[in-house]
């Protein structure tokens, strides 16, 4: 192993999908929450997506940063998988996001073959057992909470009222709700 051979303190974090309101707008989670806000604001009519059955292990990005810091605080360097240990489909994300906003995604989502990936991986789920066992780490933010945080942030960015659960979840588990805002 390279790090042992050269006596280096080096760790690898194998990070599964990590999301937040800062996520780029072309990534499916942010594409969904931003489109939801735009639809509610009357700026957009439909959201075009590809494979809704694809499943991913989506976690909350700030927690992954905390995990990376924790990995670096250990006496011995090791590699860790960082994720939630749960996989959810894009359809589940739509159900959660639009349901939270009292909307039916079926009214707004259109399937567009252009968004199907030729080499789509249908299922990705992290095995976080080593992180749980050795570092006593597991994510605090659950899937539905992550979605609510992201929906509230995009509704707020669009100047709309939010249901408010996202902010409550964030404040209960972290600190300043406006920490996600882009700095100008």
Regions found by a protein language model. Name each.
Residues 1-11, 33-41:
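Active-site Tyr-X1-5-Lys
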Residues 16-19:
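Proline-glycine-enriched beta-turn/loop adjacent to the NAD(P) cofactor-binding site
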Residues 23-184:
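C-terminal substrate-binding subdomain of Rossmann-fold SDR/epimerase-dehydratase oxidoreductases
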């Amino acid at each position: 192993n390279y790090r042992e051979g050269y006596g280096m303190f080096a760790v690898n974090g194998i990070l599964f999908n990590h999301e937040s309101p800062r996520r780029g707008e072309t990534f499916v989670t942010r594409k969904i929450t931003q489109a939801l806000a735009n639809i509610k604001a009357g700026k957009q009519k439909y959201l075009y997506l590809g494979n809704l059955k694809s499943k991913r292990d989506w976690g909350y990005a700030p927690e992954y940063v905390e995990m990376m810091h924790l990995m670096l605080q250990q006496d011995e360097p090791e590699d860790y998988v960082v994720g939630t240990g749960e996989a959810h489909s894009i359809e589940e994300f739509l159900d959660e996001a639009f349901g939270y906003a009292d909307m039916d995604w079926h009214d707004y989502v259109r399937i567009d073959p252009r968004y199907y990936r030729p080499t789509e991986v249908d299922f990705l789920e992290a095995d976080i057992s080593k992180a749980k066992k050795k570092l006593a780490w597991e994510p605090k933010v659950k899937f539905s909470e992550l979605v609510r945080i992201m929906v509230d942030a995009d509704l707020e960015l669009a100047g709309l009222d939010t249901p408010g659960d996202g902010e409550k979840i964030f404040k209960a588990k972290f600190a300043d709700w406006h920490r996600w805002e882009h700095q100008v």
